[in-house]
């Protein structure tokens, strides 16, 4: 299985292969959230990133990382996030 590092051009494809869950403060359960609605980036921002766990649809393996909700669903940067694993 080839592992492809996610770049902006790959974001739409990556988002289809992963599901995200927010680990919201004060909640014991994870809140599902579509990856296409997230900015996955480690760049500095005015808003602190929320802790998010990304799950592979194939293995169910969770990868914790920080993400920031997007105002537009077209933006999904994965440079510093998880890799995309084609299924």
From Swiss-Prot:
The superkingdom of the source organism is Eukaryota
Supply the name of the protein. Answer: Down syndrome critical region protein 10
Report the source organism: Pan troglodytes
Per the record, the gene is: DSCR10
